[in-house]
Amino acid sequence: MQYQLLINGVLVDGEGERQSVYNPATGEVILEIAEASPAQVDAAVQAADNAFAEWGQTTPKARAECLLKLADSIEQNALEFARLESQNCGKPLHCVINDEIPAIVDVFRFFAGAARCLSGLAAGEYLEGHTSMIRRDPIGVVASIAPWNYPLMMAAWKLAPALAAGNCVVIKPSEITPLTALKLAVLAKDIFPPGVLNVLFGRGQTVGDVLTGHEKVRMVSLTGSIATGEHILRHTAPAIKRTHMELGGKAPVIVFDDADLDAVAQGVRTFGFYNAGQDCTAACRIYAQRGIYDALVEKLGNAVSSLKMGAPEDESTELGPLSSLAHLKRVTAAVEEAKALSHIRVITGGSQTEGKGYYFAPTLLADAKQEDAIVQREVFGPVVSITVFDDEDQVLRWANDSRYGLASSVWTQDVGRAHRLSARLQYGCTWINTHFMLVSEMPHGGQKQSGYGKDMSLYGLEDYTLVRHIMVKH
């Protein structure tokens, strides 16, 4: 397959600097791709702006039909997408096939249906002789910046609602993991009118800044780090652009002494280490009540140490590599900083593995304190800390003592306690006796420095619209 940009309905080679794309399981170069030039970024935005005049006025049915065609096409090419995602990200192939591709297809299908249900409210007569109506209209050109942890899924989360609402999109995947987005461009070319969906490739400083700063971009949607979010907000502030930010998390997992510890251990084994822990909602910050602390540490140690690392194509592999050498170094530095603290116990893991690729052993760090960096900062790797707490008030205070506010979970058999905690936790989502469960019908998004705006659900669709008041005199 030839990897090209999609600009105004045409696949073209990039005209900028060539960048290497790596296989993180081996550390080897997969291929080189040329970035978009500033002129190509401008051409993509101009094409989107021109296409918006017609696409923004199409019927919801017409937009839905395009989204359904794209969903069908992804499903028909599922194995190729899965292989590309696995090769480029190091994900276990069976996880991409069984978990991610079906969810991606479902997102496009959900928003195809949601597009036909979005409407304004008939507000009625609030002034004598005048009738008011509320419209929800598309915004215009949306610049979408997708991350490297779930390249195709995050592209789907951004593209589906934006296009369903009638916007035109220019999307830039991460330069680390662009392959599935560029494959998606090949399919989209024959489904959407020229200019409605444009796909670029390049780094943030060479392509992203030009894209988000373009005068005709009306909205910027980012999934990335807090630092990247801050940069984009500063960069776009002079033009007062609308923004949609999902900027990471440090999910507290609150385990009370009446919890099912086997379920907790299995849950953390799965939900703390899926995708090598490179997930904003990962179950990575455990608070265990004193009465069950030692027992939970033992169970978690056994569970985490049993995770099988290996080649992505191996059916038995549960944990693949980290996405890049630079990220492996960041995770290693965070764990080494924690290990240097005298009170930290390394129950299992704690270092990168020998051999090829960017692998880091699944790690459990016990006896962490609330003020430790390993508790306060997002590591974004296969690393889980566990901290002891005494009572409900203390753990609520500690759980909320974070700059992040994306996801959390509470493990207890006490229904009243579950409701009390979920009402007071400062997180966009709180799961009870589970973690990491996402469905297209429900919103995903954070508060505090985890960002704002919702992905998925009707709330996600509304985020890509403008509320307008129409008043008719009669």
UniProtKB/Swiss-Prot annotation:
Q: Looking at the keywords, is Kinase present? A: no
Reactions it catalyzes: 4-aminobutanal + NAD(+) + H2O = 4-aminobutanoate + NADH + 2 H(+); 5-aminopentanal + NAD(+) + H2O = 5-aminopentanoate + NADH + 2 H(+)
Q: Which Pfam families match?
A: Aldedh
Spell out where the chain crosses the membrane: none
- What family classification does the UniProt entry report for this protein? Belongs to the aldehyde dehydrogenase family. Gamma-aminobutyraldehyde dehydrogenase subfamily.
Other notes: 4-aminobutanal can spontaneously cyclize to 1-pyrroline, and 5-aminopentanal to 1-piperideine.
Source species, domain of life: Bacteria
In Swiss-Prot or TrEMBL terms, this protein is called Gamma-aminobutyraldehyde dehydrogenase
Quaternary assembly: Homotetramer.
PANTHER family per record: ALDEHYDE DEHYDROGENASE-RELATED
Q: Where does NAD(+) bind?
A: A146, P147, W148, K172, P173, S174, E175, D209, S225, I226, A227, T228, C280
Q: Which keywords belong to this entry?
A: NAD, Oxidoreductase
Identify the pathway: Amine and polyamine degradation; putrescine degradation; 4-aminobutanoate from 4-aminobutanal: step 1/1; Amino-acid degradation
